[in-house]
Amino acid sequence: MRRAALRLCALGKGQLTPGRGLTQGPQNPKKQGIFHIHEVRDKLREIVGASTNWRDHVKAMEERKLLHSFLAKSQDGLPPRRMKDSYIEVLLPLGSEPELREKYLTVQNTVRFGRILEDLDSLGVLICYMHNKIHSAKMSPLSIVTALVDKIDMCKKSLSPEQDIKFSGHVSWVGKTSMEVKMQMFQLHGDEFCPVLDATFVMVARDSENKGPAFVNPLIPESPEEEELFRQGELNKGRRIAFSSTSLLKMAPSAEERTTIHEMFLSTLDPKTISFRSRVLPSNAVWMENSKLKSLEICHPQERNIFNRIFGGFLMRKAYELAWATACSFGGSRPFVVAVDDIMFQKPVEVGSLLFLSSQVCFTQNNYIQVRVHSEVASLQEKQHTTTNVFHFTFMSEKEVPLVFPKTYGESMLYLDGQRHFNSMSGPATLRKDYLVEP
């Protein structure tokens, strides 16, 4: 079982670089053509015709029904797009506009990663609308939503609340109704923007009423570098299918995994008795059931997205903050986020729902903590809970953390699933002291 480490994002590995046709890397933050962070949500409302106040949301959605005739009957009837057609840059001017800092500030004077997740979610949707832009129509007939956060890789750079941040991204792969989006985040150091984060999201297109799938414009790579990005998108799709097909919900653990669980079970048996029922916790270990934290959120209209469902970025922020608190409580010191991966949006969350979040440590190794957050919703009228998301976060603690031990078969499967996510990370690196990302 190899040691996991911080996944580094390399400028140009996940997106196009200056020499490859798209503007990247060091930039003047005052350049023309760059969106302000506040403009992203405003632009999205304009594209879909969303209401700015809750009382008009029904009327706005009724107007969107009229856009159904603009939907393509097949993908063949849609003009192809280039990667640079969807490329956009967004500025978060924490340094030049100090009034923005309060929203992003932690008590340790660093940047709230949960807020960054919200911004990435909005940016990913806007990028896809740019890819599918219809010049003859004021509003888009598509309802584009986040289907999956494939991965977010952190770089060894500190996130200062006193320096400007820039986001950039573009569509890198397209299927029939889905799109992969590559995004990067940079922070100003001196007179240049340096990369601090690399993210891959998968978005899906729905019809104007968000009831069924809709076709998206095809994507044509224009260079060997773009062809490689597109090929990587195909590989990512295959990897996700393979990972899903071998899920512990579908297949039994491997022989090696079964051995791991059995050895852990044997190490918890009381040597003073000859019984499978008497369990003793090994030294420097914690029962998995004792690592849980829970929270409840009432989903108010303020947290709605442009389609009057609860904003996916809000769900990610709340899940991340609970996961961070779980890792902090478990490890006894300040944790640092290393990776986010495989966040599947299984079901939309309606405004007015009760959101139940349950977080627990499911795997540890050395000073790494793998946290799983399970999200459920229930309406005020019905008591039945429905799963909407499962979130996976990897943290690194400032000191070595206890081992986590499962008691039941179900917890053993959570342990193995956490181990799989942990081992899926890229190979070794060291966390620098200036790498500070907090809730």
From Swiss-Prot:
A Pfam family recorded for this sequence: 4HBT
Top-level lineage group: Eukaryota
HotDog ACOT-type domain sequence ranges: 84-209, 289-401
Cellular-component GO terms for this entry: mitochondrial inner membrane; mitochondrial matrix; mitochondrion
Keywords, in A-Z order: Acetylation, Fatty acid metabolism, Hydrolase, Lipid metabolism, Membrane, Mitochondrion, Mitochondrion inner membrane, Repeat, Serine esterase, Transit peptide
InterPro entries: HOTDOG_ACOT, HotDog_dom_sf, Thioestr_dom
Interval spanned by the transit peptide: 1-21
MF term (GO), any: acetyl-CoA hydrolase activity
Primary enzyme class: hydrolase
Post-translational modification N6-acetyllysine, affected residues: 103
Biological or metabolic pathway of the protein: Lipid metabolism; fatty acid metabolism
Single GO biological process annotation from the record: long-chain fatty acid metabolic process
Activity regulation text: Strongly inhibited by NADH and CoA.
Similarity comment text for this entry: Belongs to the acyl coenzyme A hydrolase family.
Self-association state and partner proteins as the record states: Interacts with NYAP1, NYAP2 and MYO16.
Function according to Swiss-Prot or TrEMBL: Mitochondrial acyl-CoA thioesterase. Catalyzes the hydrolysis of acyl-CoAs into free fatty acids and coenzyme A (CoA), regulating their respective intracellular levels. Regulates both mitochondrial lipid and amino acid metabolism.
Name of protein: Acyl-coenzyme A thioesterase 9, mitochondrial
Organism: Homo sapiens
Encoding gene (name): ACOT9
